[in-house]
């Protein structure tokens, strides 16, 4: 057993997220309330309609007869009011956004032959002859503390001896992941591929020609007028960007389906150099992907799992430090890799702070909003020396799907948001079982909650992810129905009885 090193791999000040609740800018709170007011018409009209209905229900027959006689003598007023009512109702039905339902989703589970234990990872890394002994030791220590288990997956091109990363193998990995997830999704939903009107594929680091979305169109012979999008270079939060894009398209195009595929490609993005800031990605990222089917057809509600409540996107790219904290570049030996800067955790904390400050007014109960806002105004405007109030997001959500980017980030989010081990379990178990699957990790986490039988009708789910750019994005879902795990097919079902497991702080290899 190795002796634990005295000095941490990353300095504490760089490793920990800042206490983002202690520094909140009023403009982000204002933005959140702007979103609330924009969608607040329905909130204010609903009680008014209920009051009018309650008042009418108290009328006696004599009152109704008297009202009818009064209307007969004011026919012009009745006609004008009726026309105005019809006009307002028409405007309401024409302008209200169409609901966006998540019919179902699927997560790809690779074959057993692609499993990669920590020992296999270290053995293959050594056999490449690319890494110095010091950097092999560095990777071993990162891997020991990563939170990954012994059953994550890597593509064949990386596991082969010697490795053979090439365009052919990268396409093979992409097709395996995408088509595997889509085949399962179509089988679950019984949707004809020709009925899909919108296709969005996001993959940050692999963008071939023809595009990944074109590969899907060709393989499934999708219709010629499909709206096809291929998002690249947008990092681990790209999955929620795809959901947000699909939402806006579904709000403007009636009666159609949108299919979203979120994945990352490992084959051509394995780093074979000795720059330590690029080696961390090798230790964390693993093979995986997800396919999601969305619908704006109102009759699909009865068979859908979730309804999209809201999305909030935050982009910090205007700040140079944020923009450059995750960069794909060449090292001194001209080998390409993804650099993770020391400022990453601080940047992530700032983006997260902005995102949840904007999201808060949309989801938090009124009591929490008032306490949070009053404390904020007191501290910012009146310079009062009072302790900042940390809203309890557990009052707004029953389930949390936090991007499984790494153990340190999950630890800090658990502490800052005051979440319990139960709330963090889907994220930690996803990181342990599948590793960092980039933008698709959120869906493995939701699948975990479903497999555990936790999703009940009316439950609210918060998905939050962050990635290069720097971006932090959130989506909020409400369960349309309870999910029966016995009827589910997802990558956890055949082994869910083994989880949760205790993940050691430092594992042995």
Curated annotation (Swiss-Prot):
Membrane topology (UniProt): Multi-pass membrane protein
One term of GO molecular function: fatty acid elongase activity
Listed InterPro entries: 3-ktacl-CoA_syn, ACP_syn_III_C, FAE1_typ3_polyketide_synth, Thiolase-like
Domain of life: Eukaryota
FAE domain mapped to chain residues: 92-381
Enzyme class at the top of the EC tree: transferase
One protein family per Pfam: ACP_syn_III_C
Protein name as annotated: 3-ketoacyl-CoA synthase 11
Provenance organism: Arabidopsis thaliana (Mouse-ear cress)
Taxonomic lineage of the native organism: Eukaryota, Viridiplantae, Streptophyta, Embryophyta, Tracheophyta
